[in-house]
Amino acid sequence: MKTKRIHQRIPQRIPRIIHQIWLGDNRPKEWMNSFKLIYSDYEYKVWDETNIPALWNQDLFEREEKGCAKADILRYEILYRYGGVYFDSDMIALKKIPDEFLDNEFWSAYENEVYVPGLVNNAVIGCVPNIL
């Protein structure tokens, strides 16, 4: 995996917390469990309807009807508050991200250039708290 450093190293590292969100039924447990296995040295947190904290954008979250848009709001609020690494729940963990990724303030996945050139992806995000 090629990476390009755009930030200098900072004293605070991205916390070793994996965040995933699932709103609704039919949670893909096998896929989500792959993160618990691969990232066994990280805290693992699943956010769902039973444990959503009070949000700064609570009104927007409650008005939104689409689950994917609610998850977008929730992911940014959770990452801002706690920091860590967010992965969409429809992904399977095959291998850990390199530890040096935790030495940045923020990083995000980049979409495949062949299929969607120039698109930053929000399915995988890492950041320190209070950065977004």
Residue ranges with predicted function:
Residues 70-120:
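GT-A fold catalytic core of metal-dependent nucleotide-sugar glycosyltransferases
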Residues 1-56, 129-130:
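N-terminal anchoring/stem segment of glycosyltransferases
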Residues 19, 109, 126:
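Residues in well-ordered beta-strands of folded domains
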Residues 119-132:
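Substrate-binding rim/cap in mid-to-C-terminal beta-strand-loop elements of soluble/periplasmic
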Residues 13-16, 42, 103-105, 120-122:
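Sequence-level motif detector for i,i+2 pairs with an aromatic at +2
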Residues 45-73:
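Active-site-proximal specificity loops/subdomain of glycosyltransferases
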